[in-house]
Amino acid sequence: SHAKVETDEE
């Protein structure tokens, strides 16, 4: 959702 904030770029 953000650029590598908690590994939630899916």
Curated annotation (Swiss-Prot):
It is a peripheral membrane protein. Keywords: Heme, Iron, Membrane, Metal-binding, Mitochondrion, Mitochondrion inner membrane. GO terms for cellular component: mitochondrial inner membrane. The keyword Transmembrane does not apply. It is found in: Mitochondrion inner membrane. Transmembrane segments: none annotated. Coiled coil: none annotated. Pathway: Energy metabolism; oxidative phosphorylation. GO terms for molecular function: metal ion binding. One of its GO terms (biological process) is oxidative phosphorylation. The keyword Protein transport does not apply. Component of the cytochrome c oxidase, the last enzyme in the mitochondrial electron transport chain which drives oxidative phosphorylation. The respiratory chain contains 3 multisubunit complexes succinate dehydrogenase (complex II, CII), ubiquinol-cytochrome c oxidoreductase (cytochrome b-c1 complex, complex III, CIII) and cytochrome c oxidase (complex IV, CIV), that cooperate to transfer electrons derived from NADH and succinate to molecular oxygen, creating an electrochemical gradient over the inner membrane that drives transmembrane transport and the ATP synthase. Component of the cytochrome c oxidase (complex IV, CIV), a multisubunit enzyme composed of 14 subunits. The complex is composed of a catalytic core of 3 subunits MT-CO1, MT-CO2 and MT-CO3, encoded in the mitochondrial DNA, and 11 supernumerary subunits COX4I, COX5A, COX5B, COX6A, COX6B, COX6C, COX7A, COX7B, COX7C, COX8 and NDUFA4, which are encoded in the nuclear genome. Belongs to the cytochrome c oxidase subunit 5A family. This is Cytochrome c oxidase subunit 5A, mitochondrial. It comes from Oncorhynchus mykiss (Rainbow trout).
